[in-house]
Structures are given as C-alpha cells and as structure tokens.
Regions:
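Short, conserved beta-strand element in jelly-roll/cupin
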Residues: 183-199, 244-245, 276-279
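Histidine-centered catalytic micro-motifs
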Residues: 176-182, 258-262
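Conserved double-stranded beta-helix
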Residues: 2-28, 212-312
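Non-heme Fe(II)-dependent double-stranded beta-helix
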Residues: 14, 27, 31-176
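Active-site region of the double-stranded beta-helix
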Residues: 154-157, 180-183, 192-203, 208-211
Length: 312
C-alpha cells in the first residue's frame, strides 16, 4: 500500500550538512567530538517530524524486542549464533557463492593500487549490494534492524555494507591494531562470519565498552591505532572477545565505544559480512554510499525498513 503524502514526507532523509562539518573540523580544527552534538542538533532542527517518528518507533521496538537480541548498553555488544536470525543459513550460502565467483574475477589492478593492503579486500561494497536484493533484504530484516534501533534509541540509517575477504597475511598495521571508529558517538556494526572462523584466521577481536572506557581513562583519549602493549597497560589484558565460531555466527558491536581490531596475521582465508547502522542525524558521510531502489524484487518494506533504507 502506498504511503500517504504525510508519511512519505516523514520518511524523506534530512539534508546533509557535510560542508559545515568540513569547515568546522578540517578548517577550524575543532575536534569531532565537540562538533557532533552541535551538528546533530542542527540537522534535527531541519527535520523535527522525522526525528520524533524515528524516536517513537524505536520506543515501540524496545518494548517488543526479545532479550536475547538486545545489545547491553554497558557492554556495547551482543554475540549471536547461526540460528538466532532467520535466514542466516541461506545468506551464508549466498555469500559463499559470491566469494567463490569473485575470487576468480578479482581485479589484479586492485593489488597494484593498494600494494600495502593485505587484508579486508572488498568483494561487495556500497552500491554493488543493489545487485543482490536478497542481501539487502537480510540486512534490514527486523531482528537485525530492531536490535540496532533499540540500542541507538532511534530508527537508524543503513549507511554501509561490505562483504570482505582477508587472505593469509603477516601484518599488524592500520585496522589490525586496536582502535575506535569515529563516525559517531555510538553506532552498530554487524559482523557475520561466512566461513567457520578460528583464532588462526584473524578474527574480529574487541574489548567490551566498559573495559574500553576504563582503558581510555588510564592511558588517555585513543585517537588512532594503538599497540596491544599500550592497551594492556590500561587494563585491557585478558578482556578480549574473539569472534570465532561457525558460519553465521557473529556480533552486534558498537565500534565507536569498543576498542577492536581484526584480520591480523591470518593463516587461512576469512570472509565476513559487515553491516553499518548510524543515527540518521550523524555528521558522517559514507565513503561508499548507495541509493536503494524502492522496487526490490520480492520485498515490501515496512515503515521502519523504509526509514533505514532511505526509501521515499
């Protein structure tokens, strides 16, 4: 059933103010954690009706979300198994097929352009997911979307997705070191193992949010990549959670609050599906944005899913 003109107006995404964010941060060198609250308030002012709608729907979601699919605020993460989200087995098989096909066709020029990158090669990224409606439908299936909305307190926006392959490597650099993601004060990323993942495959490794906060209080604000020794000095030793498990296992993780790293010193291939949800009023501009068509085959999104996908 088509949306009413009033509801359709609510679903429209607020206008991005990224130029202002660039001036404040890049030119005036105001720290991003100072800019974000101001920037968000400005965007909310420009779209108050949608703001209230997203908050109201999130409140309704909290009331009905199963405890096993909620993300504890203190920990900032929730692990899940292959049977916890309906359709996971089908998506794992689909991603395995895409991976096998992509390995044969992976462009050699990518390695030439990125000679120092040895991990997290994108098999699918951004707009490429629009050619795979089954994956898009899964990414905003209500168990996944509701968990993100309940944690963030608002119906979020699907801001990014990647299917990544990490081959054997012996490196420990960049995102293979402990770090935070800085897109917003809070976010939800979903990491799903496509292959069975063990410790020798460079699994996603992270500290719970409360331990990460404790580490920051001890060593000072973490602004980049940090070696293990420094994290351990701050009390992080023996608190690591490693995302190992069978195909379809994974985690909802607030990577803005949980120190994390992954794909370090793989001995075997690792393939992971990564989905990102941010507050619609975040200052972050996706590096690989994509517009979702409103007529995905076999998919009739509800209002919450329309808001997450940015479908009018």
């Amino acid at each position: 059933m088509p949306l009413s003109s009033e509801t359709s107006e609510m679903v429209k995404q607020p206008i991005r103010q990224n130029r202002l964010h660039k001036v404040l941060h890049k030119n005036l060198r105001i720290p991003p954690w100072v800019i974000r609250p101001f920037y968000r308030a400005l965007k909310i002012t420009g779209s108050p009706t949608q703001y209230r709608l997203r908050k109201r729907l999130a409140g309704e979601i909290v009331a009905v979300t199963k405890p096993g699919m909620t993300i504890p605020d203190r920990a900032g993460y929730r692990l899940f198994g292959p049977d916890d989200i309906e359709g996971t087995d089908r998506i794992v098989r689909y991603c395995e097929t895409v991976y096998q096909q992509s390995r044969a066709d992976f462009p050699p020029e990518y390695f030439q352009k990125h000679p120092h990158k040895k991990f997290l090669f994108p098999i699918l990224e951004g707009a490429e997911f629009c050619r795979h409606p089954e994956l898009l439908r899964f990414m905003v299936s209500r168990p996944i979307l509701d968990a993100a909305a309940a944690y963030l307190g608002t119906v979020p926006k699907l801001t990014g997705a990647r299917l990544c392959w990490s081959p054997e490597n012996e490196t420990a650099r960049s995102s293979q070191l402990f770090h935070f993601d800085y897109e917003d004060l809070r976010q939800v990323k979903v990491f799903m193992n496509i292959f069975e993942t063990k410790e020798d495959q460079g699994p996603l490794t992270f500290l719970p949010a409360d331990i990460s906060h404790q580490v920051q209080r001890a060593i000072g604000r973490v602004l980049g990549r940090v070696p293990d020794e420094r994290i351990y000095e701050g009390g992080g030793r023996n608190h690591e959670v490693k995302l190992i498990g069978p195909p379809g296992s994974g985690a909802f993780l607030d990577t803005s609050r949980c120190l994390h790293y992954g794909s370090r010193c793989n001995r075997r291939d690792r393939v992971v599906l990564i989905i990102q949800f941010l507050n619609c009023y975040s200052a972050f501009r996706p590096t690989a944005p994509f517009t979702v068509p409103s007529d995905l085959p076999g998919f009739e999104p509800d209002l919450v899913q329309k808001l997450a996908l940015g479908i009018d």
